Amino acid sequence: MPWFIKTESFTKETLKLLPAQREEFISKHKDWVVNLKKLGKAISSGYLVNENKIPGGGGLLIVEAENFSAAKFLIEQDPMIVYGLVNWEMHQWIPVIGEFPTD
């Protein structure tokens, strides 16, 4: 099955939220990912950091899906997107060399 990658960054409005307010939505996102994993979906999600391990570079989600439409439908259910907290893009990833473990 093909792999799809969603990259995201907080909107300007999201960056204005207090950290506790952002964490509320991030927790909803984490719960969404955990529930998908429990349903057997191959998915991995995390955030990006700089060389000093300081977050702020955005997030990355990798998911296996039947096709582009199915992946987009699934990703559009991410609470970070539903609540309009991130700017995002999705692309199909075609691995050429190596293997990708999902856990």
Where are these regions (language model features)?
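Conserved, structured core segments of small domains
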Residues: 1-103
